[in-house]
């Protein structure tokens, strides 16, 4: 149910409480590339149809694992959207670090970005470790594993040979498993972490945890029932899978860890100092599932807030306009836009009709034009594939967008204005390479693309990472304008200032890149974006209208992560 969160790859890990001699207690499967989720589901479903033939005794013992290897007691799943690194199976979560005991074995998955991976790597070196690879995922795995090892040694020292309990062998291993404190482990491991994250982890003996960054940048939700505990990045997914009421699913408080012991004991506790919340807004605009009622209401309102600007841009041409949306995730905001625009136009018509009646100038032939619905809504663009091009890998995105859209013909009279609501216009690749070209075949006079998100001007290194500034269409538009106005020297000035800042206080950063945008007002940049989105073969005029940051903040005041 969360396949919307990533399509580069998928993985599942499971803990098996009962296992035969020499058999693995942790099982893992990962797949990458096209069809990865279907392939993964086939792997983990292996043998499930034979489970019904087992006796109760066999179900309670290790026999079920030989029949169905992924039938376990604790499971961890992940869908990969790779912001950095590769897209192979080796990069898919969960990652696994095997220890010589179950309590030292860790499986980890997460939605996250660490902004200081290099500093964290240096910290591991100071611990005397020799980590292999410098990816932020590997570094986090190594750091948690290190302090998990420390925790094991502390308990062994307190309970092992020579202590008052003087335990050894299996008795000592069991006591270590009982006493492991994952809150304490994560308190130590998370020192110096800087980023946004939601991590889930499994230990080989069956303990599990879920931890969230202190600013709440990445979302996390928990459903607790008498017989199980479940957690996910999205509330709507939990509600659908377990048929649970929305009010039964609670947010994992930012800065908290949910610890689930093998015994079933549950603890939620802070593990890192609290910070002012900055929940990511782009999660709500684009990434999350739209069937969450709160997200549905927010997306409707984002569309509604754009209606006055859209009608102002259309002017007298509103009767010649057709409203639609692209991609599918923009449908709810488009509905909000159409509703609000219809309401405003009807109010204008009612005022005009009242004035005509009051002044005695009303004529019968005017009434039809004033009372008939004015805002026309059609589904014009259709995706041939259920793929989200924004989260496709760079290598495949261009080929993908060329063929992913088609249009409904004979709905739009030639010379019309198309109002296309998009949830966000970030790189502009899909619009330029596919959507504008295919909509142009309908012979409109102009296409007005309306973005429910503001201009994306900066990398969001803490949230949904869009890590290469030079690919943003807003940045390319600003650079194009600087070049046109003979101000290209500003780019070098900003680069020098940014490089100097690398050696300064990291806790007092200055956004020097804002000077590039500050040379022009938002409307001028939007006009240049429209130019960049227009392919050479297009015959229609292309225009762009963006949501304001103020209206975005008013729509979702509890989500203050606006880096736009």
Located regions from the model:
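PRPP-dependent phosphoribosyltransferase catalytic core
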Residues: 190, 205-207, 212, 219, ...
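Phosphate/ATP-binding catalytic cores across multiple sugar-kinase/actin-like superfamilies
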Residues: 192-195, 298-319, 332, 337-340, ...
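Conserved short alpha-helical segments that host acidic/polar catalytic motifs at enzyme active sites
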Residues: 1-253, 259-322, 326-327
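Terminal amphipathic helices with adjacent charged low-complexity linkers/tails
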Residues: 264-279, 325-362
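Extended, hydrophobic alpha-helical segments in both membrane/secreted and soluble proteins
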Residues: 323, 330-337, 341, 377, ...
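Cofactor-binding active-site loop characterized by glycine-rich and histidine/acidic residues
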Residues: 34-87, 335, 340-346, 357-409
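Hydrophobic alpha-helical segments characteristic of transmembrane helices
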Residues: 148-152, 307-308, 314-346, 364, ...
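Active-site proximal loops enriched in glycine and acidic residues that flank catalytic Cys/His/Asp
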Residues: 201, 212, 233-235, 262, ...
């Amino acid at each position: 149910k969360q396949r919307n969160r990533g399509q580069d790859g998928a993985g599942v890990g499971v803990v098996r409480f009962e296992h035969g001699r020499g058999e693995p207690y942790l099982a893992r499967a990962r797949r990458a590339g096209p069809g990865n989720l279907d392939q993964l589901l086939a792997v983990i479903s292996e043998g499930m149809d034979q489970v019904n033939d087992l006796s109760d005794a066999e179900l309670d013992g290790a026999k079920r694992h030989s029949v169905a290897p992924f039938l376990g007691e604790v499971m961890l799943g992940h869908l990969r959207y790779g912001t950095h690194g590769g897209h192979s199976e080796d990069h898919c979560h969960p990652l696994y670090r095997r220890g010589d005991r179950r309590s030292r074995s860790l499986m980890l998955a997460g939605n996250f970005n660490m902004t200081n991976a290099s500093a964290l790597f240096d910290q591991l070196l100071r611990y005397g470790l020799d980590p292999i690879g410098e990816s932020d995922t590997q570094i986090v795995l190594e750091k948690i594993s290190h302090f998990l090892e420390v925790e094991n040694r502390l308990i062994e020292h307190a309970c092992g040979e020579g202590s008052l309990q003087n335990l050894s062998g299996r008795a000592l291993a069991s006591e270590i498993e009982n006493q492991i404190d994952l809150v304490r482990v994560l308190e130590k491991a998370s020192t110096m972490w800087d980023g946004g994250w939601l991590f889930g982890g499994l230990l080989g003996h069956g303990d599990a945890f879920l931890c969230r960054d202190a600013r709440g940048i990445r979302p996390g939700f928990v459903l607790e029932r008498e017989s199980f505990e479940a957690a996910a990045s999205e509330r709507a997914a939990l509600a659908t899978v377990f048929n649970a009421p929305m009010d039964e699913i609670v947010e994992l408080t930012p800065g908290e860890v949910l610890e689930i012991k093998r015994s079933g004991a549950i603890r939620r506790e802070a593990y890192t100092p609290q910070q002012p919340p900055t929940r990511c807004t782009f999660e709500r605009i684009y990434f999350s599932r739209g069937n969450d009622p709160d997200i549905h209401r927010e997306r409707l309102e984002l569309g509604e807030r754009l209606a006055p600007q859209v009608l102002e841009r259309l002017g007298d041409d509103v009767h010649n306009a057709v409203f639609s949306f692209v991609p599918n995730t923009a449908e709810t905001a488009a509905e909000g836009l159409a509703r609000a625009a219809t309401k405003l136009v009807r109010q204008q018509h009612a005022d005009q009709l009242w004035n005509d009646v009051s002044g005695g100038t009303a004529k019968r032939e005017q009434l039809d034009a004033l009372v008939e619905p004015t805002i026309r809504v059609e589904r014009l663009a259709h995706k041939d594939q259920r793929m989200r091009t924004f989260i496709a890998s760079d290598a495949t995105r261009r080929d993908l967008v060329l063929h992913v859209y088609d249009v409904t013909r004979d709905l739009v009279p030639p010379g019309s204005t198309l109002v296309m609501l998009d949830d966000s216009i970030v790189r502009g690749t899909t619009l330029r390479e596919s959507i504008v070209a295919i909509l142009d075949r309908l012979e409109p006079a102009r296409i007005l693309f309306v973005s429910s998100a503001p201009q994306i001007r900066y990398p969001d290194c803490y949230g949904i990472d869009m890590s290469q500034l030079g690919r943003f269409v807003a940045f390319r538009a600003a650079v194009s304008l600087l070049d046109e106005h003979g101000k290209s020297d500003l780019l070098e000035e900003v680069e020098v200032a940014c490089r100097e800042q690398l050696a300064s206080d990291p806790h007092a950063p200055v956004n020097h890149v804002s000077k590039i945008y500050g040379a022009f007002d938002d409307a001028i940049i939007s006009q240049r974006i429209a130019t960049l989105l227009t392919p050479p073969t297009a015959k229609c005029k292309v225009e762009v209208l963006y949501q304001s940051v103020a209206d975005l903040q008013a729509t979702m005041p509890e989500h203050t992560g606006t880096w736009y």
